[in-house]
Amino acid sequence: MRQQFQSIFKIPELRKRILYTLTLLIVVRIGAHIPIPGIDSEVLGAAIRNYANTLFGLYDLFAGGAFSRATLFALGIMPYITASIILQLLGSVIPYFQKLQREGEEGRKKLTQLTRYGTVIMTLMQSFGISQFLMSPQMSARIGNQLLPVVPNPGIGFVMMTMLSLTTGTILIMWLGERITERGIGNGISLIIMIGIIDRLPNVVVSEIAMVREEVRGIFTEIVLIGLMFIIVGFVVLLTQGQRKIPVQYAKRVVGRKVYGGQATHIPLRVNTAGVMPIIFAQSIMFIPNTISTFFPNSNLIQGMMSFFSVSQPVYWIIFGLLIVFFTYFYTAIAFNPVEVADNMKKYGGFIPGIRPGKKTSEFIDNILTKVTLPGSIFLAFIAVFPYILMKVMDINYDLASFFGGTSLLIIVGVALDTLQQIESHLLMRHYDGFLKSGKLRGRH
């Protein structure tokens, strides 16, 4: 393993990509600590504790703690993800967007531009809602003998400044994510979410150590939780790496005096082709009711309806699990096109033994992919709702439960594996050993 890490720094391009990625991630974390103007940080810190186990607390997890601090990056990358989901859903039903999806690189550029415009619109809406929420009467706390508001000077000036600050922050974080994807290593959006989640881990560990010392929680309970975490990590790795191999045979072709083809290969169908995207997509959808509620902070009806979407309610987790199953199939259909694979195989003389080339091949691949995706999506949903089971069975808060299963753990493990696979690809291209499997090509020294 040490040799593999040393190999990274022997490849100039890979070294530059990693350093570039780390630099931009540091910029993201700095932005997550710069507060928007007009906020009393001390009062905010006291007032936000009441929302730790609600959807606000979960949103804060995705924003890397920036939401609870009301910083420039308080909205995180979620408006961008929501805009992406809307455009991809529109691509399934509206001919114009379907046409853009088929236009290759030019269509992709147009969709990216539309996603950016959508992100700005979503950010303006959410930032207005947050400004109303911060100015609401419930966002106050007792400091000493005084009940103080989070916003000392509410009004149109604060609303405009909040909208400008949060919109600028979201556009910047979106741009940083795109730069990481293009010029760094890994998926920029996923890495930004992952680094925000990891940022909260030290506080959780310190809190648990304090609880054990104060005998609030027994050491046996902590050992069980740690054991569960390792078991779940193992299953998540198996889920991410597991695949079904479909054998493919290429017919021999004679071109001039040369013989081409004749070799056997396979199509790897991953159990979880969609990766962590279904979780991120499902979570962003679950945040929509929360966003709507910020527009009506004083409405008892809206706030009462929001109680059903609390992370402590089973309704929230049932809907969340079903959304994960749906988005697993939805994103798999986008990421893997059986018709395109079958056409390419037919074009180059490839076929699946016992299956006729063309339409029959695409139907066969689609059938196998559907069967493989089903258990993967169900397991993904189960791991995502596991924190609710922990909260009920072991009486722990969501912050802790999320690190021993659920969204946080799935994103951390999934993004880490995806990034390692990209690093491994760079190493193998230059004949160095990879991280994830033994027996790779040796470096030529």
PLM regions and their residue ranges:
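N-terminal cationic and glycine-rich segments that engage phosphates or anionic surfaces
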Residues: 1-101, 105-445
